[in-house]
């Protein structure tokens, strides 16, 4: 028996004999996130950071300002540009990066699994966001009393 608590952004809290539906869902989500424009993803996280700052800064606590800064479009865009040879669009399409013999296109790994520590709530968000902006789907094992996701 496998217990599924959350799937496709909805609380389920059910047990299942087979996780095939979850596997199919992950594969569908991989296709969906790969089809998203990188600038749209960055804009989403920028808006999410501002929303959390406005609505949940007390719950997030002392790390609220750091989280908002991390989620900013400017910060995440810089991280991508550094990781992707100076051009984040390489995750969208083939790009000529001035190598006469090559053109580049970054591919997501696919599925990233996160085990989130219960003693540092905010750390899990950083790794999940980095997986998502590189167009990877996340499977998250959160501690029992995890409130941020």
Where are each of the predicted segments found?
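N-terminal Rossmann-like NAD(P)+-binding subdomain of aldehyde/semialdehyde dehydrogenases
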Residues: 1-107
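Conserved small-residue-rich beta-alpha loop and adjacent elements
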Residues: 92-149
């Amino acid at each position: 028996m496998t217990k599924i608590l959350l799937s496709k952004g909805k609380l389920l809290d059910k047990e299942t004999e087979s996780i095939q539906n979850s596997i199919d869902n992950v594969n569908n989500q991989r296709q969906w996130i790969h089809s998203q424009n990188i600038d749209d993803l960055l804009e989403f996280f920028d808006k999410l950071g501002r929303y959390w700052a406005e609505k949940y800064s007390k719950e997030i606590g002392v790390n609220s300002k750091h989280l908002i800064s991390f989620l900013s479009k400017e910060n995440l865009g810089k991280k991508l540009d550094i990781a992707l040879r100076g051009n984040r669009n390489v995750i969208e399409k083939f790009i000529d990066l001035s190598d006469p013999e090559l053109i580049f296109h970054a591919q997501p790994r696919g599925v990233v699994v996160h085990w989130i520590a219960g003693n540092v709530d905010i750390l899990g968000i950083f790794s999940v966001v980095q997986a998502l902006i590189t167009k990877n789907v996340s499977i998250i094992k959160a501690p029992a009393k995890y409130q941020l996701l």
